[in-house]
């Protein structure tokens, strides 16, 4: 076959009688599309047969979930990589307007993964879908839509229901021939005259299979490998099982075409367990960090490049936030994400690799396995490093209490000691200033208490009781030096490297997330636990286990509010803490606190004592242990009230009206109060 360019399907080229027609060096360049499928035998046959000068693979979804290393086939050389957000920013795709719409509640039942078929094709649901498709519309002279369903019978029944109401649609699945699919695509893209409602004017002499289509209903096809530029409306009637598949289905409408300014994406969201995958897919955020995912639901359009928009209705937001709260990091998911990075870079990844590549948040490995190397040892047979029990304890201490980057002081101290330096207070101050931090003796002393484990309490104190990082003898003289035991451990090169990687990762987190802090060492709207607040506000000891709603100590009064309280808590703790507006917050003390109580008087007379009152809020206990930092507050008015305990007895309680230093940002305010 004497041609310069040869195009072939994999199925054809992999046939023995065709493949053997070509010598191994017949082609200078071989380009394989849909390369993520290259783990299949037919692809292997082709790749192993030829020896081109250039083998190039192209795919929109390189991440496989079956453990096959696609990158290895190409020597781990990534020529170019562009994600959805990059393509939108570079104007390579058609802008989209995404609307997350609550699916219908039928007979008191929400649509979910287990919903019976009779509800999926219910007349009420059909009317709801049609009403929304007509309301949100499309760009162009008529609708040309793809509708993704969860089941074949659902697709067929909905197609019949649409046709009964005057639409022209077909249902397709993997059971249908390629010819039937191509014919349907041609009919969907067909240009024709339309009436005032944008509906095709069908001439009586045109046979049905030549008439233009309004919609194609599909189940397990059209996710990939099909190009229909004219699609101007994509409707999703199925749960999101994978962020990859979501983007593939979204992408069916993102091709540019004449007379198409944008594509409308309608996502009918039921009570699905995987709803958290929707913001992950739309944002392209691969960290699986819950706060990042929540932020995208709150601020989606603001974070998208170009003129694309994202909107969730209020019921849908609630469903997605609830799904995010339930989101768990399983061993399977963590292993999958770990292996994807390992395959991508062609070696055992360090903790820094995940952060630099914008992949899964490395703190999830630590939360799951206590240390990153513990996780590696469990899931990666190529990882053969083994540390002693004491070394593991030190790594666990650094991983759980220091590397989150919420303060650089401990990271810097350890790094200086790792480099062999004894740390004098003046040399530490210079290093601190070099990274843009002001030196404060209180912060320095607090960091020393953490490093010497004086700050640590409770379960942490028991867990790390055998660790000694600092020489106690030198500590008394004001000099920080490595203890003999720690120095001995650092002779292990692998151990030293592991600590160095952890510290570098911690400093990256600090610079990206926490460097822009206020004088309280806290970032406005950053997330902090009670333990974090004890440390960052320079308390002598971790008193988080007994802090509860608030505590006045060391000239500070951190207040922690759970905005949506559980129904099963005692009557005397059902405080009605709430925003009056974005600048004003109504807060109740614990019960049995009267106006003449010492706590009340300290808050009332905050100016005289210099008491700093700082407010932290989380929406519900489903968010975990961390609270949003809302900044400093000052009392503007107060009143003694009463609250009943479980026995009906009236107890005194103080109601303070606080003015916030910073008016609450709109998206945070809406999230907390709605």
Tell where the protein language model's regions lie, with residue ranges.
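Conserved helix/coil segment N-terminal to the catalytic DExD/H
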Residues: 1-29, 40-45
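Conserved helicase ATPase core of P-loop NTP-dependent helicases/translocases
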Residues: 18, 157, 167-222
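Post-DEXD/H (motif II) to motif III coupling segment of the RecA-like Helicase ATP-binding lobe
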Residues: 37-97
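Conserved interdomain linker/interface between the two RecA-like ATPase lobes of SF2 helicase motors
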Residues: 78-149
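Long, largely alpha-helical accessory region at the distal end of helicase-like NTP-driven motors
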Residues: 140, 145, 151, 282-415, ...
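Conserved segment of the helicase C-terminal RecA-like domain
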Residues: 243-248, 252-282
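Acidic, glycine-rich low-complexity segments with interspersed aromatic residues
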Residues: 380, 391-401, 407-413, 519-626
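Compact mixed alphabeta submodule
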Residues: 622-674
């Amino acid at each position: 076959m004497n041609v310069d360019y040869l195009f072939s399907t994999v199925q054809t080229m992999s046939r023995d009688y065709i493949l053997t027609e070509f010598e191994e060096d017949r082609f200078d360049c071989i380009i394989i599309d849909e390369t993520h499928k290259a783990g299949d035998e037919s692809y292997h046959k082709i790749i192993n047969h030829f020896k081109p000068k250039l083998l190039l693979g192209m795919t929109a979804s390189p991440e496989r979930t079956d453990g096959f290393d696609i990158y290895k086939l190409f020597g781990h050389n990534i020529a170019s990589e562009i994600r959805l957000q990059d393509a939108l920013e570079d104007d390579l795709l058609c802008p989209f307007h995404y609307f997350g719409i609550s699916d219908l509640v039928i007979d008191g039942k929400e649509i979910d993964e287990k919903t019976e078929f009779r509800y999926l094709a219910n007349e009420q649901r059909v009317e709801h879908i049609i009403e929304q498709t007509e309301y949100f519309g499309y760009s162009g002279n008529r609708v040309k839509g793809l509708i993704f369903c969860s089941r074949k019978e659902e697709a067929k029944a909905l197609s019949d229901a649409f046709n009964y109401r005057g639409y022209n649609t077909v249902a397709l699945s993997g059971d249908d021939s390629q010819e039937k699919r191509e014919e349907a695509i041609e009919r969907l893209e067909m240009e024709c005259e339309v009436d005032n409602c944008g509906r095709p004017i069908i001439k009586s002499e045109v046979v049905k299979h030549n008439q233009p289509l309004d919609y194609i209903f599909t189940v397990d096809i059209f996710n990939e490998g099909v190009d229909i530029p004219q699609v101007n409306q994509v409707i999703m009637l199925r749960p999101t099982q994978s962020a990859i598949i979501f983007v593939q289905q979204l992408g069916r409408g993102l091709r540019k075409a004449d007379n198409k300014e944008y594509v409308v994406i309608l996502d009918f969201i039921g009570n699905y367990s995987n709803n958290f995958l929707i913001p992950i897919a739309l944002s392209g955020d691969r960290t699986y960090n819950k706060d990042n995912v929540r932020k995208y639901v709150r601020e989606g359009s603001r974070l998208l490049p170009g003129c694309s928009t994202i909107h969730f209705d209020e019921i849908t937001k609630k469903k997605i936030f609830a799904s995010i709260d339930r989101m768990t990091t399983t061993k399977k998911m963590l292993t999958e994400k770990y292996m994807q990075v390992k395959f991508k870079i062609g070696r055992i990844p360090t903790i820094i690799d995940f952060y630099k590549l914008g992949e899964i948040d490395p703190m999830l490995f630590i939360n799951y396995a206590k240390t990153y190397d513990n996780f590696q040892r469990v899931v990666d047979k190529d990882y053969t490093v083994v540390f002693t029990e004491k070394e593991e304890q030190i790594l666990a201490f650094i991983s759980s209490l220091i590397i989150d980057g919420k303060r650089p002081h401990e990271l810097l101290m350890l790094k200086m000691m790792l480099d062999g330096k004894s740390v004098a207070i003046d040399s530490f101050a210079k290093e601190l200033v070099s990274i843009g931090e002001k030196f404060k003796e209180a912060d320095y002393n607090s960091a020393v208490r953490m490093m010497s484990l004086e700050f640590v309490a409770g379960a942490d104190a028991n867990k790390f009781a055998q660790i000694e990082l600092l020489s106690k003898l030198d500590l008394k003289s004001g000099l920080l030096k490595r203890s003999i035991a720690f120095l001995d451990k650092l002779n292990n090169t692998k151990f030293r490297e592991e600590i160095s990687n952890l510290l570098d990762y911690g400093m990256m987190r600090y610079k990206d997330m926490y460097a822009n802090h206020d004088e309280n060492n806290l970032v406005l709207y950053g997330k902090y636990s009670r333990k974090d607040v004890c440390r960052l506000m320079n308390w002598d000891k971790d008193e988080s286990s007994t802090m509860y709603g608030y505590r006045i100590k060391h000239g500070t009064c951190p207040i922690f509010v759970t905005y949506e309280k559980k129904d099963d808590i005692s009557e005397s703790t059902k405080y009605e803490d709430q925003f009056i507006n974005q600048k004003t917050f109504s807060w109740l003390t614990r019960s049995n606190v009267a106006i003449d109580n010492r706590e009340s008087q300290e808050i009332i007379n905050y100016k005289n004592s210099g008491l700093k009152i700082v407010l932290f809020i989380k929406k519900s206990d489903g968010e975990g242990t961390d609270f949003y930092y809302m900044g400093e507050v000052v009392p503007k008015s107060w009143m003694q009230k009463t609250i009943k305990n479980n026995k009906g007895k009236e107890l005194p309680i103080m109601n303070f009206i606080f003015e916030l230093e910073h008016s609450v940002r709109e998206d945070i305010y809406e999230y907390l109060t709605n």
